[in-house]
Amino acid sequence: MIEIRNLTKKFGDFTAVDHLNLTIETNEFMGLLGPNGAGKTTTISMMSTVLLPTEGEILIDGEQLNRKAATAKRKLSVVTQEFSMRQDMTMNEVMEYQGRLYYMRKKEIRAKTEELFEFAGLSQFGHRVVRHLSGGMKRKLMICRALMTEPQILLLDEPTAGMDALARRQMWDLLRSLKDRNLTILLTTHFIDEAQALCNRVAFIDGGKFDVVDTPLALIEQLGPFAVDILQDNKLQSSYFPTREAAIERLRELPDDAVLRATTLEDVFVERVGHRLTRG
């Protein structure tokens, strides 16, 4: 279990993360959803001890996480947004190097590499040099590298950033399969459809603060599962209703170009935070 208590990070007079409180249960897939600059990466950086908090603390199974907390740190791995690998290495060499950092035996490294590459669909590419990989393959390799030491917690910072639609959906399939590995996962993203498709719960973050934390379905139900859209003065106006019947009744009162549709997580975010995030 991860407990984030009063977590704050300041850079001079600028507060990047502002008194966050959150509990992530064991084996939960948690999404941290917000626009660029909202504080997502700063939060991940503190959880990976790259940055130290100005205030507050992070607990991993009750143990405070810091740069000296060896037991807690061994429980987690991070997949950063940047491609943090030597470009002249082969994929097999990347995995071997990671294994040696953790004093794994050669036989163990080889077996684990084979298992993870099969899991990620990379089995036939082990001898390919990193610089020749697509962005999607690099991210898959980074996930395999992060899983090399069998962590209990996986931190994923914008894992589909820069991918085209097909590559993103393929990555989603891989991320869904991580649920079968008994991992606690924290995913940061600015793609609303990604959070809705993958996460058990989502936390909206904006300006370094949490706005709301709940399941995607519960958030949609709170706003109203049915929406009616109408274009007024070249602006899309949306209204939300608790039942389909109520939405249809409103629809009858509007011009013919009004549209009935299902409410999405994006609608919830726009209503709560006031930002229009990137559509998938």
Label each PLM-derived region with a short phrase:
Residues 154-157:
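Catalytic Walker B motif of ABC-type/P-loop ATPase nucleotide-binding domains
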Residues 170-247:
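ABC transporter nucleotide-binding domain
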Residues 129-133:
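Conserved ABC ATPase signature
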Residues 56-67, 71-72:
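Conserved ABC transporter NBD signature motif
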Residues 96, 100, 107-125:
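Conserved ABC ATPase "signature" region
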Residues 150:
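Conserved catalytic motifs of ABC-family nucleotide-binding domains
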Residues 143:
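Hydrophobic anchor residue at the start of the ABC signature
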